[in-house]
Structure formats: C-alpha cells, structure tokens
C-alpha cells in the first residue's frame, strides 16, 4: 500500500456528486470564498473539464497551464498553475476542457489515482484549506480528489431525482476508504437549489434527511437568481450580492463545515 505523507492543509474538501446540475460548482466557489474571507489562505482546485469554477474567478484564456498539464506533464506541477483570484486569500488552480481526455492519457499508469495527492504534498503548507470541484462523474479525476481529500461534501438538489446515483458515489467512497485513503470523512450533505414554496421540494428535503440523518447540514441553499448570476461577473456571492440570502446561506454553511471538521 502506498504511504500517506502529510499534506499540511487543515481541510481538503472534495465537492462531489456524479449528477450534474446540483449546485456543485456554486458550492465549491462560494465555500472556498467563505473560507478565504476568514483570513486563511485557500486554494480552489478545478477538476471539472467544463471549467466553470475557473471561469467564475479567472479569464482562463490567459492561463497557459492548467490542471490537465499537472496530470500529464511531469515537468508541470501544481505550483506552476496556481493563480491568484481577485478575492484576497483565494487562489485558483484552473481546469480546461482537455481534462475530459485525461482518463485515456493515463490508462495503465499505476500511480494515476495518486497524482493529485502527490502534488498537494509538494505545496508544503502554503494553503490552510483546499476545496476541490469534482466533475459530474466517478472517473479518475474524482478518484484523485477523494484519495487526496480529508473530507467530502455532497450537494444534493431538492428535486424529484435528488437521490439518483448517490449509491454509486457512496460505493466509490467506501472503496477509496478501504485502501488508498482510510481517513476520508463524509463531512456532510448540503441541500441545494431549494424552493421552499413548493410542497415537492419540502417533501424531498424530508426524504434526504431521512436517508442521511445527521449528515445533512442544517443550512439549506435556496434557489437564487443572484447565485446563478454571480459567476458571469467573476465574483463570489459575497462580493456580487453581499446582502442576499445566498451570501448568508453559504456563510452559514461555511460555519457548519468548520464546526464539523
């Protein structure tokens, strides 16, 4: 079994759900921003080939290197691709669409699931917290994130098919815990895109709480136009609409995350 070198970050949180459209990226960018607002250096790693976390803070056309290069080029390291964002204490390791081809590039490489963990070790404590935006799939990128992480946060939309696919995610988590990362903890489940005006959303929220029990955060993220708009302006909800319900909810979620970790 591979060793488990110390990464020195207090929390490394993967935001993962193989279902798309559940508020995963919105949660990643705003949780990272909330952690940075507390005065601690925070790194947001974008592993989603769509690159939405990256585009929420950066003009990715200006980035000559991305996480794809970190995985496939032995001479490119995580420190080479990290860029500062406009928000104090928050840095970004951007993604590009080329990440979608990563699995075929690394097929057969025995150390492929450990590449991100090895790169995080090399940061040697530069960041207090790390947030990883995973792709909506359970492939090599998500496995890399889970192997490298201390904690996992699962966003689930309060919609009819909310729990679809969660069994597969939980099975993957258990496989990662069995060997490469026995210390991985499920930090919790956050209900997202919730419309409290509808009976269906309220029923789904109750169902999610029955399935996951006390793993579900008290904070619920409401469906919000402001949350949808803020990435277009390359801002977190905290600078785009600081008095909005979305800002209050994500800051509350951050407080719960810190308490649980």
Segments (PLM) and residue ranges:
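P-loop NTP-binding core
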Residues: 1-261
């Amino acid at each position: 079994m591979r060793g488990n070198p110390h990464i020195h970050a207090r929390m490394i949180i993967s935001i993962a759900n193989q279902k798309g459209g559940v508020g995963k990226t919105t949660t990643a960018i705003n949780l990272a921003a909330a952690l940075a607002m507390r005065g601690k250096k925070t790194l947001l790693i974008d592993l989603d080939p769509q690159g939405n976390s990256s585009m929420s803070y950066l003009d990715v056309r200006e980035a000559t290197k991305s996480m794809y290069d970190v995985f496939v080029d032995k001479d490119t390291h995580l420190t080479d691709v990290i860029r500062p964002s406009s928000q104090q204490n928050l840095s970004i390791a951007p993604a590009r669409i080329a990440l979608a081809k990563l699995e075929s590039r690394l097929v057969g490489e025995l150390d492929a699931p450990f590449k991100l963990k090895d790169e995080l070790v090399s940061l040697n404590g530069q960041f207090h917290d790390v947030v990883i935006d995973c792709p909506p799939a359970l492939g090599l990128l998500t496995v890399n994130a889970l192997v490298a992480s201390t904690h996992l946060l699962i966003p689930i939309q309060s919609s009819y098919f909310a729990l679809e696919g969660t069994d597969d995610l939980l099975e993957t988590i258990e496989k990662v815990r069995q060997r490469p990362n026995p210390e991985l903890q499920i930090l919790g489940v956050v209900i997202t895109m919730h419309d409290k005006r509808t009976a269906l959303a309220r029923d789904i929220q109750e169902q999610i709480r029955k399935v996951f029990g006390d793993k579900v955060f008290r904070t619920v993220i409401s469906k919000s136009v402001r949350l949808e708009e803020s990435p277009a302006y390359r801002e977190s909800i905290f600078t785009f609409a600081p008095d909005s319900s979305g800002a209050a909810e994500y800051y509350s979620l951050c407080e719960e995350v810190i308490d649980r970790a």
